[in-house]
Amino acid sequence: MSAPPERRPATLDDPPVDVSDPHELLLRYLDWYREALLRKLDGLTEPELRAPVGPLGWSPLGLVKHLGWVERRWMRWGFAAEDVLAYPSEDDEAEWRVPADESVGDVLAAYHDEVRRSRALAASADLAEPARLGGRFRAAAQAPSLGRILFHLFQEYARHVGHLDIARELLDGTVGE
């Protein structure tokens, strides 16, 4: 027995159903969530982007800033062992705060830059390749594979895009993918 058409879930538009390579699938789904994050910001005013949402305590723009730090921490410092600042120096909550002198454009540009760098690193390595030593990971026994790191990013985005979906509904009633 099948569900009536109005009860069938929408078909995801990406990745296409004929993509079966695990590396490509993972990267395409991760990009889908990155794009969903940005879609959920569409139509919000600057005050809505900056204001903490209800009981959540963070702003939509703060979430974007946090995910930029997550990309940097896991891909550049974690996987590539680049000598980069992995956490803001102020305190644990600093990566969620957007000061008044930091523009929406600045936050989005920094986020896009980290995503671009992550994509380049992920495209140039095999899923089984271990993280390089010297950044986040000091010993081979600690170093996860690129695949494991990408799955971590995937779950981070899935969780936070879901949070943003709730935040958006609280802000203006908008729901959906």
Residue ranges and their predicted role:
Residues 20-26, 104-108:
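Active-site rim elements
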